[in-house]
Amino acid sequence: MPIVQFGNLYYFIYIFIGILLTLLVLRFLKHKSQKYRYWFLFGLLVFNFIVHIGKIFIPMYQNNVEYLITKVSFENICAVSAILFPFLYFTKNKTLKDYMVMVGIASGVITFLFPVDAMSTRFNGLDLGVYRHAFREIENIRFYLSHYIIFLVPFLMMHYGMHELSIKRAWRAPFMLILVLVIIFINELLMTLFGWVPKSELFDPNKRNPSFIFGVVGSLGGLGMILGIFVPSFLRVNPFYSGPAFFPVLWLVLPAIVYGGLIALLMMLIYDRDHTLRFFHLKHKLKLPEEVEPIEHE
């Protein structure tokens, strides 16, 4: 059975499809007006919102999730994006729009490079014991499509000059990410309070564990080791849970600041290169032109 595994043919097929679709969309929008592009992107966000909500009708959810409402809540970072991006798209708040752009592009790219859900036998905190068919399992297609749109819209916003990133605001992005993790934690508490998630599973990293807010699955290896470098020992215990687990959300604060900061810096070097080099006093050393627009003070 064809399944998606890291580095195999089907893994690269999905990446190729994503790149091809991006080129086709760019070609389609090339001679369209800016107004058309603006509403076209909003239409994509609305479509993705429907894709996110509509997943409760997919057999994998119908057969393995007792309370389907838990799967259309703020259960992870990308779910928050799918739900909130149609609203953030219209915001005048530059910090919120920065978050939308940076997290959208980054999470979309990371998902295609490391499609954990598509490669795993786990679903909703359960090990189903079988891998998903690369193309016949509709959840796989939905997974890739939704994350692709989460990437595509912010990418096109930047490509067509609908938003501008600024190195002066870059420091805010990791803290916005931490705020979203807190929202996910509150969402999980509410799901438990309403009886939609068993209390015994609330803090268990081997169950739902949305966006790893309760720790990593298994030992500190792989992803756990990458995140765990910046986690002090006192945050590697959870006083509210008897089993092995990390302190909810707080254990992710330093990793979010470090890795989120690096991603934000990379975005600035791509989209606000001149101002970023000036900010770090590198422009003269790299012998780049000095003619740049003034850095906005926000």
Residue ranges and their predicted role:
Residues 47-56, 104-116, 177-189:
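Aromatic-anchored segments of alpha-helical transmembrane domains
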Residues 1-8, 29-39, 54-68:
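Short juxtamembrane and helix-loop transition motifs at transmembrane-helix boundaries
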Residues 32-46, 95-101, 173:
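Membrane-interfacial loop-to-transmembrane alpha-helix junctions, especially the N-terminal start
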Residues 3-14, 171-179, 191-264, 288-291:
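Membrane-interface transmembrane-helix boundary segments in multi-pass integral membrane proteins
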Residues 11-20, 71-82, 97-100, 113, ...:
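Membrane-embedded alpha-helical segments of multi-pass membrane proteins
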